[in-house]
Amino acid sequence: LLQPPFIPSEEAVEWANRSVDFSKDCGAKVTSLIPTRTGNGAMDRLATAGQFTEPTLDQLEDAMDYGVGLARGRVFADLWDLGRFSSCETCFPQRKARLGKQNDTQQVPIRITCPSCR
């Protein structure tokens, strides 16, 4: 999971990367990066209590770039309801397409630059 509860936001990518490393060290051929979401009740209560924040699209891209860049088996990003993690409507379609391309090709494409948000 990317950005599980009780993990400070600034440590989320580091812990996701460590999870990818661990899965590969255990022999996993496929690893999925799943952004932790509110909406199931428990996460909502933790968010209200200040113990959970949803990850950002930047964090998912960072973790995917790391995982795919290792070239130690396949790494996939869960793209369901991805728009909730984006803060920019201008570049979101391109960034979503980039992650989809990563899922399909297992290559690390050039990052999208956006004059509106970056």
Stretch-by-stretch model annotation:
Residues 17, 22-118:
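Auxiliary Fe-S-binding modules of radical SAM enzymes
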Residues 3-7, 37-40:
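Short, catalytically relevant binding-site loops at active-site mouths
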Residues 4-18:
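Canonical radical SAM enzyme core domain
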